[in-house]
Protein backbone atom coordinates (compact mmCIF):
# COMPACT_ATOMS: atom_id res chain seq x y z
CA UNK A 1 0.00 0.00 0.00
CA UNK A 2 1.50 3.30 -1.11
CA UNK A 3 0.52 6.37 0.85
CA UNK A 4 1.29 9.82 -0.53
CA UNK A 5 0.52 12.97 1.41
CA UNK A 6 0.16 16.23 -0.44
CA UNK A 7 -0.80 19.66 0.85
CA UNK A 8 -4.46 20.03 0.00
CA UNK A 9 -4.03 23.06 -2.28
CA UNK A 10 -7.54 24.08 -1.38
CA UNK A 11 -9.19 27.15 0.05
CA UNK A 12 -12.49 26.77 1.82
CA UNK A 13 -14.18 27.69 5.05
CA UNK A 14 -15.30 24.09 5.61
CA UNK A 15 -12.66 21.43 6.24
CA UNK A 16 -14.78 18.67 4.71
CA UNK A 17 -14.83 20.58 1.44
CA UNK A 18 -11.07 21.05 1.35
CA UNK A 19 -10.56 18.21 -1.07
CA UNK A 20 -12.68 19.57 -3.87
CA UNK A 21 -11.38 23.04 -4.60
CA UNK A 22 -7.93 23.53 -6.06
CA UNK A 23 -6.47 27.02 -5.82
CA UNK A 24 -6.55 27.87 -9.50
CA UNK A 25 -7.90 30.73 -11.55
CA UNK A 26 -11.03 30.52 -13.68
CA UNK A 27 -11.99 27.00 -12.53
CA UNK A 28 -8.99 25.40 -14.21
CA UNK A 29 -8.36 21.98 -12.68
CA UNK A 30 -5.42 20.46 -14.59
CA UNK A 31 -1.86 20.40 -13.24
CA UNK A 32 1.25 19.82 -15.34
CA UNK A 33 4.50 18.64 -13.77
CA UNK A 34 7.41 20.38 -15.50
CA UNK A 35 10.05 18.19 -13.89
CA UNK A 36 13.59 19.65 -13.97
CA UNK A 37 12.62 22.61 -16.16
CA UNK A 38 14.42 25.91 -15.70
CA UNK A 39 12.42 28.77 -14.16
CA UNK A 40 12.87 30.94 -17.25
CA UNK A 41 11.47 28.19 -19.47
CA UNK A 42 8.48 27.57 -17.17
CA UNK A 43 7.63 31.28 -17.21
CA UNK A 44 7.65 31.24 -21.00
CA UNK A 45 5.57 28.04 -21.08
CA UNK A 46 2.92 29.67 -18.87
CA UNK A 47 2.71 32.67 -21.18
CA UNK A 48 2.98 30.90 -24.55
CA UNK A 49 1.03 27.68 -23.98
CA UNK A 50 -0.43 26.73 -20.61
CA UNK A 51 -2.73 29.73 -20.18
CA UNK A 52 -4.41 29.01 -23.52
CA UNK A 53 -5.11 25.32 -22.90
CA UNK A 54 -6.83 25.36 -19.54
CA UNK A 55 -3.95 24.47 -17.26
CA UNK A 56 -4.46 25.69 -13.71
CA UNK A 57 -1.09 25.01 -12.13
CA UNK A 58 2.48 23.86 -12.63
CA UNK A 59 4.26 21.59 -10.18
CA UNK A 60 7.94 22.52 -10.20
CA UNK A 61 11.02 20.65 -9.01
CA UNK A 62 12.41 21.46 -5.55
CA UNK A 63 13.69 25.06 -5.67
CA UNK A 64 16.06 24.92 -2.69
CA UNK A 65 19.87 24.74 -2.86
CA UNK A 66 20.91 21.12 -3.35
CA UNK A 67 23.76 18.68 -3.74
CA UNK A 68 25.73 19.01 -6.96
CA UNK A 69 27.35 15.77 -8.12
CA UNK A 70 27.84 14.21 -11.53
CA UNK A 71 26.94 10.64 -12.37
CA UNK A 72 28.10 9.13 -15.67
CA UNK A 73 29.11 12.61 -16.89
CA UNK A 74 25.61 13.93 -16.27
CA UNK A 75 23.67 15.57 -13.45
CA UNK A 76 21.07 13.07 -12.16
CA UNK A 77 17.58 14.13 -11.12
CA UNK A 78 18.01 12.88 -7.54
CA UNK A 79 20.45 15.62 -6.57
CA UNK A 80 17.40 17.92 -6.38
CA UNK A 81 16.13 15.77 -3.52
CA UNK A 82 19.25 16.21 -1.37
CA UNK A 83 18.93 19.74 0.08
CA UNK A 84 21.91 21.74 1.29
CA UNK A 85 19.96 24.81 2.44
CA UNK A 86 16.63 26.52 1.85
CA UNK A 87 18.14 29.22 -0.34
CA UNK A 88 16.45 29.59 -3.72
CA UNK A 89 19.54 28.57 -5.68
CA UNK A 90 19.03 25.42 -7.74
CA UNK A 91 19.98 24.04 -11.12
CA UNK A 92 16.65 25.45 -12.35
CA UNK A 93 17.82 29.00 -11.68
CA UNK A 94 18.35 31.82 -9.22
CA UNK A 95 16.01 33.36 -6.66
CA UNK A 96 15.30 36.30 -8.97
CA UNK A 97 14.41 33.90 -11.79
CA UNK A 98 12.13 31.90 -9.48
CA UNK A 99 10.29 35.04 -8.33
CA UNK A 100 9.94 36.22 -11.93
CA UNK A 101 8.52 32.83 -12.96
CA UNK A 102 5.93 32.85 -10.16
CA UNK A 103 4.87 36.40 -11.01
CA UNK A 104 4.60 35.76 -14.74
CA UNK A 105 2.69 32.50 -14.34
CA UNK A 106 0.29 34.01 -11.79
CA UNK A 107 -0.30 36.96 -14.11
CA UNK A 108 -1.70 34.63 -16.78
CA UNK A 109 -3.71 32.54 -14.30
CA UNK A 110 -1.34 29.58 -13.87
CA UNK A 111 -0.45 28.81 -10.26
CA UNK A 112 2.82 27.35 -8.97
CA UNK A 113 3.01 24.25 -6.75
CA UNK A 114 6.39 23.64 -5.11
CA UNK A 115 7.88 20.21 -4.47
CA UNK A 116 9.15 20.53 -0.89
CA UNK A 117 11.91 18.28 0.50
CA UNK A 118 11.75 18.51 4.30
CA UNK A 119 12.24 14.92 5.48
CA UNK A 120 16.01 14.99 5.13
CA UNK A 121 19.10 16.78 3.89
CA UNK A 122 21.94 15.21 1.83
CA UNK A 123 23.06 11.62 2.02
CA UNK A 124 25.39 10.68 4.83
CA UNK A 125 29.06 11.06 3.90
CA UNK A 126 28.56 13.90 1.41
CA UNK A 127 30.82 16.89 2.03
CA UNK A 128 31.33 19.96 -0.13
CA UNK A 129 34.86 20.06 -1.45
CA UNK A 130 35.36 16.31 -1.54
CA UNK A 131 36.06 14.89 -4.98
CA UNK A 132 33.26 15.88 -7.35
CA UNK A 133 30.92 17.11 -4.61
CA UNK A 134 29.53 20.63 -4.49
CA UNK A 135 26.28 22.54 -4.15
CA UNK A 136 24.04 24.44 -6.53
CA UNK A 137 24.68 27.62 -4.53
CA UNK A 138 27.32 29.07 -2.25
CA UNK A 139 26.58 27.19 0.99
CA UNK A 140 29.08 24.92 2.68
CA UNK A 141 27.97 21.56 4.11
CA UNK A 142 29.38 18.48 5.78
CA UNK A 143 27.20 15.37 5.86
CA UNK A 144 29.75 13.14 7.53
CA UNK A 145 28.20 10.84 10.11
CA UNK A 146 28.18 12.60 13.48
CA UNK A 147 29.08 16.01 11.97
CA UNK A 148 25.95 16.76 9.92
CA UNK A 149 26.62 20.46 9.50
CA UNK A 150 24.50 22.61 7.17
CA UNK A 151 25.30 26.26 7.98
CA UNK A 152 23.25 27.58 5.06
CA UNK A 153 20.10 26.74 7.02
CA UNK A 154 21.59 26.42 10.51
CA UNK A 155 21.24 22.68 11.02
CA UNK A 156 23.75 20.61 12.99
CA UNK A 157 23.81 17.06 14.35
CA UNK A 158 21.33 18.00 17.10
CA UNK A 159 18.63 18.57 14.49
CA UNK A 160 18.65 15.03 13.09
CA UNK A 161 17.10 11.75 14.23
CA UNK A 162 20.35 9.89 14.95
CA UNK A 163 19.40 9.64 18.63
CA UNK A 164 16.28 7.75 17.62
CA UNK A 165 17.76 5.61 14.86
CA UNK A 166 21.36 5.60 13.70
CA UNK A 167 20.96 3.74 10.42
CA UNK A 168 18.83 3.09 7.36
CA UNK A 169 15.25 1.90 7.00
CA UNK A 170 15.11 -1.82 6.25
CA UNK A 171 12.83 -3.23 3.58
CA UNK A 172 10.72 -5.15 6.08
CA UNK A 173 10.09 -2.02 8.16
CA UNK A 174 7.43 -0.88 5.69
CA UNK A 175 5.22 -3.80 6.69
CA UNK A 176 5.43 -3.61 10.47
CA UNK A 177 7.57 -0.81 11.91
CA UNK A 178 6.32 2.76 11.57
CA UNK A 179 8.88 3.97 14.11
CA UNK A 180 11.79 2.97 11.88
CA UNK A 181 10.10 4.20 8.69
CA UNK A 182 9.75 7.66 10.22
CA UNK A 183 12.92 7.89 12.32
CA UNK A 184 15.57 6.04 10.34
CA UNK A 185 17.39 7.21 7.23
CA UNK A 186 15.74 6.75 3.86
CA UNK A 187 18.46 5.21 1.64
CA UNK A 188 21.18 6.94 3.66
CA UNK A 189 19.66 10.43 3.64
CA UNK A 190 20.26 12.37 6.86
CA UNK A 191 16.86 12.30 8.56
CA UNK A 192 15.67 15.59 10.06
CA UNK A 193 13.84 15.69 13.39
CA UNK A 194 10.69 17.65 12.54
CA UNK A 195 9.74 17.50 16.21
CA UNK A 196 12.57 19.93 17.01
CA UNK A 197 11.23 23.49 17.21
CA UNK A 198 14.20 24.94 15.32
CA UNK A 199 13.60 22.54 12.43
CA UNK A 200 9.90 23.40 12.42
CA UNK A 201 10.79 27.10 12.38
CA UNK A 202 13.16 26.73 9.43
CA UNK A 203 10.80 24.62 7.34
CA UNK A 204 7.72 26.76 7.98
CA UNK A 205 9.78 29.91 7.46
CA UNK A 206 10.88 28.71 4.04
CA UNK A 207 7.34 27.73 3.09
CA UNK A 208 6.07 31.13 4.22
CA UNK A 209 8.74 32.80 2.10
CA UNK A 210 7.37 30.91 -0.89
CA UNK A 211 3.79 31.88 0.00
CA UNK A 212 4.88 35.53 0.16
CA UNK A 213 6.40 35.17 -3.31
CA UNK A 214 3.05 33.90 -4.61
CA UNK A 215 3.25 30.11 -4.54
CA UNK A 216 -0.20 28.50 -4.30
CA UNK A 217 0.57 25.07 -2.86
CA UNK A 218 3.05 22.35 -2.01
CA UNK A 219 3.79 18.72 -2.66
CA UNK A 220 5.58 17.28 0.37
CA UNK A 221 8.21 14.75 -0.63
CA UNK A 222 8.64 11.59 1.49
CA UNK A 223 5.62 12.47 3.66
CA UNK A 224 5.17 8.92 4.92
CA UNK A 225 8.63 9.20 6.49
CA UNK A 226 7.55 12.09 8.75
CA UNK A 227 5.20 11.99 11.74
CA UNK A 228 1.72 13.41 11.00
CA UNK A 229 1.79 15.42 14.23
CA UNK A 230 5.06 17.06 13.23
CA UNK A 231 3.72 17.92 9.79
CA UNK A 232 0.56 19.36 11.31
CA UNK A 233 2.64 21.52 13.64
CA UNK A 234 4.75 22.82 10.76
CA UNK A 235 1.85 23.48 8.40
CA UNK A 236 -0.10 25.08 11.23
CA UNK A 237 2.46 27.88 11.18
CA UNK A 238 1.85 28.79 7.56
CA UNK A 239 0.44 32.13 6.48
CA UNK A 240 -2.67 32.58 4.42
CA UNK A 241 -2.17 32.50 0.69
CA UNK A 242 -1.82 35.87 -0.98
CA UNK A 243 -5.22 37.33 -1.81
CA UNK A 244 -4.30 37.71 -5.49
CA UNK A 245 -3.44 34.00 -5.65
CA UNK A 246 -6.41 32.66 -3.69
CA UNK A 247 -9.81 32.44 -5.35
CA UNK A 248 -11.75 32.24 -2.09
CA UNK A 249 -13.97 35.09 -0.98
CA UNK A 250 -13.76 34.54 2.76
CA UNK A 251 -10.86 32.23 3.59
CA UNK A 252 -7.56 31.65 1.85
CA UNK A 253 -5.98 29.36 4.39
CA UNK A 254 -3.93 26.54 2.91
CA UNK A 255 -5.50 23.32 4.21
CA UNK A 256 -3.21 20.66 5.60
CA UNK A 257 -3.24 17.31 3.87
CA UNK A 258 -4.74 15.35 1.08
CA UNK A 259 -4.10 11.62 1.30
CA UNK A 260 -3.95 9.17 -1.57
CA UNK A 261 -3.96 5.42 -0.88
CA UNK A 262 -3.38 3.19 -3.85
CA UNK A 263 -2.63 -0.48 -4.30
CA UNK A 264 -1.78 -0.39 -7.98
CA UNK A 265 0.57 1.46 -10.27
CA UNK A 266 0.32 5.20 -9.75
CA UNK A 267 -1.00 6.71 -12.96
CA UNK A 268 -2.62 9.98 -11.99
CA UNK A 269 -3.95 12.08 -9.15
CA UNK A 270 -7.47 13.45 -9.05
CA UNK A 271 -7.76 16.82 -7.30
Q: Which residues does each predicted region cover?
A:
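N-terminal pro-sequences and low-complexity stem/linker regions of secreted or lumenal proteins
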Residues: 34-39, 52, 63, 108, ...
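Boundary/entry segment of secreted carbohydrate-active catalytic domains
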Residues: 15-39, 186-196
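Short glycine-centered, acidic/aromatic-flanked micro-motifs in structured strand/loop junctions
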Residues: 34-36, 88-90, 222
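Aromatic- and acidic-residue-enriched carbohydrate-binding clefts of CAZyme catalytic domains
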Residues: 26-29, 66-103, 140-193
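Active-site-proximal helices and loops of the catalytic beta/alpha 8
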Residues: 7-11, 16-30, 44-51, 55, ...
Amino acid sequence: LLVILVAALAVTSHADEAYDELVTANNRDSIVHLFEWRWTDIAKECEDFLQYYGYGAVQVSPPMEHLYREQNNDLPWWIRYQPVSYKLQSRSGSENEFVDMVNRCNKVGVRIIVDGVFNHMTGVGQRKGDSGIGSSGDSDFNGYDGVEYFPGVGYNKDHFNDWRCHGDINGGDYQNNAERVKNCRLVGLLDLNQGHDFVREKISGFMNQLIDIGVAGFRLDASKHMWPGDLAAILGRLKNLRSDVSNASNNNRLELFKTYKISELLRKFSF
